[in-house]
């Protein structure tokens, strides 16, 4: 039997105006956005709907904004939202957990806000960067990264075959980019990000978030969630918490996650939230599946 997977995007999909149409047309959306303003202690809706790109790009704003857009969109689907499985890319994992009933809306938002602030502090304490690498097999990239001496640099996002992101110390990432270009990478491009996400440089954030996650009540999700760290289905709350904590310093194994969902019967992938990045990645990983978006 064919199954439907709902997937939730991470940082990078944000744009000014996101969520405005939902707010204006759905009473439930308006109620949840206003609740979010109260929980966060500032009017995030003002920045989302009519702020500047610079305001929206602040990590403490971007992460809650993306979470809110995706989760509220999913909740507004009502009975139409019938996932057989869910997954989220990086930050999107929190959206997926709330949509699947493993976390309450309020607790999910508090954790995402905590995650954003902890990551911001880790970026300031341990400056780093990330770079997109295109046109080399994943194994080749990993092999070359092992030869880079001095500093931290690891494969951080396995997005789709031939497209991954590396993360680490600025100098080590720059040297890795040169080595990867020499090895035949079509592109090795530094990204405009605030730090070395999904690398050991995020350890202070992992410690801070671990405490908050352990203190939060999680529930068994209504369907399996395919988490970034193990890249397979997880149902138990203990495992979900452990993987959420590990995710901050571990790679996002998106390619393997999508492959696992397809192996378990997914033939239709619906991206919930701004943009269509995940639909593009899913099509590159599994060309035979159907994709659509709910923005």
Feature roles, as predicted:
Residues 251-266:
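A short, acidic, amphipathic alpha-helical segment used as a generic capping/interface helix at domain edges
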């Amino acid at each position: 039997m064919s199954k439907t997977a709902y997937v939730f995007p991470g940082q990078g999909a944000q744009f000014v105006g996101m969520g405005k149409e939902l707010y204006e047309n759905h009473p439930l959306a308006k109620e949840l956005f206003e609740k979010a303003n109260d929980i966060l202690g500032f009017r995030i809706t003002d920045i989302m709907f009519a702020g500047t790109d610079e305001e929206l790009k602040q990590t403490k704003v971007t992460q809650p904004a993306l979470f809110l857009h995706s989760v509220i969109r999913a909740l507004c689907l009502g009975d139409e939202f019938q996932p057989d499985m869910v997954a989220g890319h990086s930050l999107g994992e929190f959206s997926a957990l709330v949509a699947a009933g493993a976390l309450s809306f309020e607790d999910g938002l508090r954790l995402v806000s905590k995650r954003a602030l902890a990551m911001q502090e880790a970026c300031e304490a341990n400056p780093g960067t990330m770079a997109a690498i295109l046109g080399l097999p994943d194994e080749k990239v990993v092999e070359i990264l092992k030869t880079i001496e001095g500093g931290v640099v690891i494969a951080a996002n396995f997005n789709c075959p031939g497209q991954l992101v590396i993360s680490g110390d600025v100098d080590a990432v720059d040297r890795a980019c040169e080595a990867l270009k020499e090895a035949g990478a079509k592109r090795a491009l530094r990204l405009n990000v605030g730090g070395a996400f999904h690398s050991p440089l995020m350890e202070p954030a992992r410690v801070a978030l671990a405490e908050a996650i352990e203190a939060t009540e999680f529930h068994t999700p209504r369907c399996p969630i395919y988490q970034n760290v193990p890249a397979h289905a997880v149902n138990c709350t203990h495992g979900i918490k452990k993987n959420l904590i590990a995710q901050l310093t571990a790679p996002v194994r998106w390619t393997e996650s999508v492959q696992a969902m397809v192996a378990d019967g997914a033939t239709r992938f619906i991206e919930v939230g701004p943009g269509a990045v995940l639909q593009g990645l899913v099509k590159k990983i599994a060309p035979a599946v159907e994709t659509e978006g709910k923005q």
